[in-house]
Amino acid sequence: MIKPGLLLLIFFAPLVSAQDWMATSFEHTEVSPGIYMLSGAEGKMSGGNITLITGTEYVVLIDDGFTPLGPALLQKIEALAGRPADFVINTHAHGDHTGTNQYLDEHGALIFAHDKLRARMESDPEQNTGPGALPIITFSEEMTFHFNGHEAYVFHVPSAHTDGDAAILFRDANVITTGDLLFRGLFPFIDLDSGGSVSGYKAGMQRLIDMSNDATRFIPGHGPVSTRSDLRQDLEMLVDAEARVKTLVDKGLSEEEIVSANPLADYHDDYNWGFITTERMTRSLFRSLTTE
C-alpha cells in the first residue's frame, strides 16, 4: 500500500523537480492577534497549513509540514515568536503534517497528539522519522491548553480523515484549526486505509459547523483561511457527491461503470486537484459505500 505522503511526492516528482514545487520559506497570515497560519511562500508546497500561536508564555505550533523544511520552519517561528516552539500539536499522522516533528523535538518542543496518531506513526517507517518524531503526550478524547490568554480546546474527531484526527478550538479568539477535516474548495482526501470514513468525515465537518458562528475563522488543513459558509458549501458538495455515487451503486453499476458515468462531472472545475482528482473522489466514494 502506498502511503499518502509518498503519493504526494509521486504525483509531483514526474512533473518537476522538488526545488520547483517544494517551498523553501514560509509566508504567514495573521488570523487573530498572535495566531498565524503558515504556508509555503510563493504558492509552493510546504505540506499542510500550520498554525502558530505566539505570546509571552509559550510558543505553540499545530502541525509542521514536510521533513526537509525543518530549518525554514524554525526560522519563520523565530521571526514571528522570537524563539522556537515549546509545544507541537499534531492533527493527524500524515507526513505533510508531522514531517518536522523530529527536528522540532531536537529544538526543545514537546509533541502532543491523539492516541491513535502515535500508534500509526510507530508502525509506519515513512511517518516515524526518528525517536523524537513520536508524540510523548497523547489523549483519547479531549484536552485543554491554557496559555498566552488562550483556552485551546483539543478534541478527537473519530474515523474522519483518519482514525486519529484532532481539531482545535480557540474559544477566546473564535478560531478553529481543522487539520484535514477541511480541504477548502478541494475534493477531500479521506484515508480509508488509515481508519477514515466518509460518514465520519461528514460528521466531523458538521461538528465544526455546529460549534462555530458566522464570525469564526477556520485554518484548514489545505487551502485559505475559511468561514462557516465555506465549510457548509464543502460539506454540501460531499453529501451530494456521495448521494450521486450511491444512486448508481444502488442500480448495480460496477466501479468502472460509475467512473465512466462521471457523476461528479459538474464539480470538476471547482474541486478537482492533482492529488484527489474527480476520478479518485468517485472511486473513494464507491469504495466507502460498498465497504463501510
Predicted regions mapped to residue ranges:
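N-terminal signal peptide c-region/cleavage motif recognized by signal peptidases
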Residues: A13-S17
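Conserved beta-strand hairpin/beta-sheet module of binuclear metal-dependent hydrolase folds
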Residues: H28-K76, I168-F170, V175-T178
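Active-site metal-binding motif and surrounding structural segment of the metallo-beta-lactamase
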Residues: G55-V60, P68-F112
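Bacterial N-terminal signal peptides that target proteins for export
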Residues: M1-L6
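Accessory terminal helices/loops
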Residues: Q19-D20, D210-R217, V225-E292
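Metallo-beta-lactamase
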Residues: Q19, A23-S25, T29-E30, E57-V59, F66-P68, K116-D163, ...
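Divalent metal-coordination and catalytic microenvironments
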Residues: G34, I53, D63, I77, ...
